[in-house]
């Protein structure tokens, strides 16, 4: 009989995309996969499109919100727990996988109430509130970065589940010896990167640099106009659909330090200048960036000290030192966990009794 797995993942791509990677491995192993999410998160669009049944919870995050939201939190969480309880009783899963974020809280708690094996996976180097709490009651605790949880949690480091296209970098290595710069302003647009990076690139001089810049929809026109004002040729897009191709094309990335970005850079062996989002909860992006920087795979530049002059100096230093780029690429690949999705799926199936 096929094992039944419920996945708890929602809100942002940082939770949803690694969960989809695991879901694909589970489905290929013959398991039935169901999803629990919200109607307002990314999962509402991409999970049904991937062919997975999804059930809805009425819940949202409360950290960083105002007093009014926090006052409503107990009632909201109570309702979400009741919804999760009904869903789990109807779906009858053999195991539940929580991928962090507010969606995982009610479903994870109700899984334990019903005696269903609970596995959690943390994508960041600093665990989020939900996973810190669930780690005390979960049957298995998995982490993307070694040491994310305290030793008492008994966590196993699996790495972050990668999209199938990113996994293919395991089988080929692209030499990073050119002058191709990939700028990732994020799906929502990172103002600091979109406004400072073009000006820094305009200061480089010397050999020409090929530029690709993902701006996010909100800042696309402004950034494109800025490149034109600076007389710089650049391929500017609101979104880059084929990230595998972009990673393979680039010799250097300039970007934020979300968990999946850091993991994909490592898998692609792509050297990077990382500018962590300074307002991320618990400053987890700085911790993520440190993981690559400490290994010599990236340069960390705090946004508080970022300006076009210092950034231009760093970009020039990297592009002019081909040996250093290659060393950074090798260091990144040494950190990669190409089998993370398979490892997480295997734990789920073990707990499900497969």
From Swiss-Prot:
The EC number(s) attached to this protein equal: 2.4.1.227
Report the GO molecular function annotations. Answer: UDP-N-acetyl-D-glucosamine:N-acetylmuramoyl-L-alanyl-D-glutamyl-meso-2,6-diaminopimelyl-D-alanyl-D-alanine-diphosphoundecaprenol 4-beta-N-acetylglucosaminlytransferase activity; undecaprenyldiphospho-muramoylpentapeptide beta-N-acetylglucosaminyltransferase activity
Check the record and name the SUPFAM superfamilies matching this protein. Answer: UDP-Glycosyltransferase/glycogen phosphorylase
Q: Which InterPro entries match?
A: GlcNAc_MurG (IPR006009), Glyco_trans_28_C (IPR007235), GlycoTrans_28_N (IPR004276)
Top-level taxon in the UniProt lineage: Bacteria
- What CDD domains does its record include? GT28_MurG
Chief location bin: membrane
Q: So, what pathway does this thing act in?
A: Cell wall biogenesis; peptidoglycan biosynthesis
State its location(s): Cell inner membrane
Q: Which reaction does it catalyse?
A: di-trans,octa-cis-undecaprenyl diphospho-N-acetyl-alpha-D-muramoyl-L-alanyl-D-glutamyl-meso-2,6-diaminopimeloyl-D-alanyl-D-alanine + UDP-N-acetyl-alpha-D-glucosamine = di-trans,octa-cis-undecaprenyl diphospho-[N-acetyl-alpha-D-glucosaminyl-(1->4)]-N-acetyl-alpha-D-muramoyl-L-alanyl-D-glutamyl-meso-2,6-diaminopimeloyl-D-alanyl-D-alanine + UDP + H(+)
What does the record list as GO biological process?
A: carbohydrate metabolic process; cell division; cell wall organization; lipid glycosylation; peptidoglycan biosynthetic process; regulation of cell shape
- One Pfam family from the UniProt entry? Glyco_tran_28_C
Which residues bind UDP-N-acetyl-alpha-D-glucosamine per the record? 12-14, 124, 163, 187, 240, 285
What GO CC terms are in its UniProt record? plasma membrane
Protein topology in the membrane = Peripheral membrane protein
Which keywords does this chain's UniProt record carry?
A: Cell cycle, Cell division, Cell inner membrane, Cell membrane, Cell shape, Cell wall biogenesis/degradation, Glycosyltransferase, Membrane, Peptidoglycan synthesis, Transferase
UniProt record similarity statement: Belongs to the glycosyltransferase 28 family. MurG subfamily.
Instruction: Tell me the PANTHER family matching this sequence.
Output: GLYCOSYLTRANSFERASE, UDP-N-ACETYLGLUCOSAMINE--N-ACETYLMURAMYL-(PENTAPEPTIDE) PYROPHOSPHORYL-UNDECAPRENOL N-ACETYLGLUCOSAMINE TRANSFERASE 1
Name the job this protein performs: Cell wall formation. Catalyzes the transfer of a GlcNAc subunit on undecaprenyl-pyrophosphoryl-MurNAc-pentapeptide (lipid intermediate I) to form undecaprenyl-pyrophosphoryl-MurNAc-(pentapeptide)GlcNAc (lipid intermediate II).
Q: What is this protein called?
A: UDP-N-acetylglucosamine--N-acetylmuramyl-(pentapeptide) pyrophosphoryl-undecaprenol N-acetylglucosamine transferase
């Amino acid at each position: 009989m096929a094992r039944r797995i419920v996945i708890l993942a929602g809100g942002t791509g940082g939770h949803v995309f690694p969960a989809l990677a695991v879901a694909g491995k589970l489905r290929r192993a013959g398991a039935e996969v169901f999803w629990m999410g919200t109607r307002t998160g990314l999962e509402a669009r991409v999970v049904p499109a991937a062919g997975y049944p999804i059930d809805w919870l009425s819940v949202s995050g409360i950290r960083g919100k105002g007093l009014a939201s926090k006052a409503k939190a107990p009632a909201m969480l109570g309702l979400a727990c009741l919804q999760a309880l009904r869903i789990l009783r109807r779906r009858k899963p053999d195991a539940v996988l929580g991928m962090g974020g507010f969606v995982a809280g009610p479903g994870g708690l109700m899984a334990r109430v019903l005696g269903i094996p609970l596995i959690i996976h943390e994508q960041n180097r600093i665990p989020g509130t939900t996973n810190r709490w669930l780690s005390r009651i979960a049957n298995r605790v998995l982490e993307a970065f070694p040491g994310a949880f305290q030793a008492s949690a008994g966590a196993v480091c699996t790495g972050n589940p990668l999209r199938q296209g990113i996994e293919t970098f395991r089988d080929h290595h692209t030499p990073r010896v050119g002058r191709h710069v990939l700028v990732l302003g994020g799906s929502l647009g990172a103002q600091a990167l979109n406004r400072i990076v073009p000006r820094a690139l305009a200061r480089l001089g010397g050999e020409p640099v090929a530029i690709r810049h993902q701006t996010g929809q909100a800042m696309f026109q402004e950034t494109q106009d800025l490149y034109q004002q600076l007389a710089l040729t650049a391929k500017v897009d609101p979104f880059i659909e084929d990230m595998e191709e972009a990673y393979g094309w680039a010799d250097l990335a300039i970007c934020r330090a979300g968990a999946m970005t850091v993991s994909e850079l490592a898998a692609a062996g792509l050297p990077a200048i990382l500018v962590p989002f300074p307002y991320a909860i618990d400053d987890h992006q700085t911790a993520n960036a440190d993981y690559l920087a400490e290994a010599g795979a990236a340069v960390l530049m705090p946004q508080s000290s970022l300006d076009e002059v210092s950034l231009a100096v760093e970009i020039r230093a990297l592009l002019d030192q081909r040996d250093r780029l290659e060393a950074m690429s090798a260091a990144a690949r040494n950190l990669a966990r190409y089998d993370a999705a398979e490892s997480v799926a295997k734990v789920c199936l073990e707990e499900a009794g497969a």
